[in-house]
Amino acid sequence: MTARLRTARSTGMLLLALLAAACTRTGAGPAAPAATPAASATAPAGAVATGAYPDLFAEAGYARAEVEAKIQVAFQQLFHGDQAQQAVYYEDGSNEHGPLAYIHDVNSGDVRSEGMSYGMMIAVQLDRKAEFDAIWNWAVTHMYQDDPAHPAYGYFAWSVRTDGVPIDEMPAPDGEEYFITALYFAAERWGEGDGRYDYRAQAERLLADILHRQPITGMTARGQMTAVNLFDHQAKMVRFTPDLANAAHTDASYHLPAFYEVWARVGPQADRAFWREAALVSRDYFARAAHPRTALTPDYGNFDGTPWAAPWRPESADFRYDAWRSAMNWSVDWSWWALDPRQVEMSNRLQAFFEAQGMADYQSLYTLDGKPLGGGQTTGLVATNAVASLAADHPRRLAFVRALWEQPVPSGQHRYYDGMLYLMALLHCSGDFRAWLPEHADDGN
């Protein structure tokens, strides 16, 4: 707060200094991409600064008791409901470290780092330490690569069988991002444990590896492979994957500037400047990747914001299952930190597009310019579109919140992805998805 006030008071001096620098600068190189717009002195402070996380359900007219009951019903069904049709959380015995449990992608028949990290984030937000620890124990036991000679060393296999046998040993970086942030939040909520339950130490080890791990060439189930770190140092951007063949690409839904701001406050001091800049880069990336009319982003992208049609999946240039989460990511960033007003306009643009498609009829898959590609209406997209209301400021925003409220808790064959996004959206829209930070955390300025 002090730094912000100091900045506001010295605006005139800063402008003079910048003008002088501009007048003396010569031999400039190519123009850099437009920087994230600076927040004005009258811009609203984010929820992390104020402690007031928006309760969109209250704005839409729902009583707090109803909201809390709805969240608990969803949690109990998805974590402790009927295992044949409702649950995605499965207890799996115990080992020397304690109970084990996994989040099951029922439709695909595997366990994914994405879902495991989502499960941990949900658990820490709801103060469910037992479930958090059991998921983390399973992930470290069955998914973490601890062989220094393996290209995935220091990361988690993104897909394994329910018995822990890897399907793909390489990581999907969004899993690591959610693991790290959930571990930091756990350290703040519950304090430090021992061994693998020393949450802060575990988070910092992972955070160091995703940024600093050196290239490793070695054998995998798919043959010899070379893999690097999960963040490109030059682009300051999360990679699609660390294997060299695809490391120069990204995935819009892996961009989590709200989390990078957390890391810039509680992570290793030497890397905090990098994470602050990574947050700025991701905000600029969203502004470039979002279609100018629809605000839809592709599943996979190039570092310059253009879509990437992966050779094995050319439809990745469209708005598909991964891309549902992009608006959720930039809207949470606005809600928590309120540093980029472009996010308000992008959420307004996105919701205007879906409203025009028909609130009850919009599909799940589109070209970036808005041509429907089918998929029907799914709870997962309804959920992420509701979270976009954290940034949107048009009155239509509450229609998307009410649409989420009317959705039943996902069950059946597709309950994993829909269910995880649904429960996280309930937490976001109720003000119960929070950044758990120590009071003395660096303010990031």
Q: Model-derived features: where do they sit?
A:
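Bacterial N-terminal signal peptides that target proteins for export
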Residues: 2-13
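Hydrophobic alpha-helical segments with transmembrane-like composition
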Residues: 181-192, 253-258
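C-terminal motif of bacterial Sec signal peptides marking the signal peptidase cleavage site
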Residues: 21-22
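N-terminal carbohydrate-binding/catalytic regions of secreted carbohydrate-active enzymes
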Residues: 48-176, 182, 192, 347, ...
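C-terminal functional modules
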Residues: 363-445
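Ser/Thr-rich, Proline-interspersed low-complexity disordered segments
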Residues: 29-44
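Extended ligand-binding clefts on enzyme/binding-domain cores
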Residues: 43-73, 77, 84-87, 109-113, ...
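Inward-facing hydrophobic residues that define packing positions of alpha-helical scaffold repeats
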Residues: 136, 183, 200, 207, ...
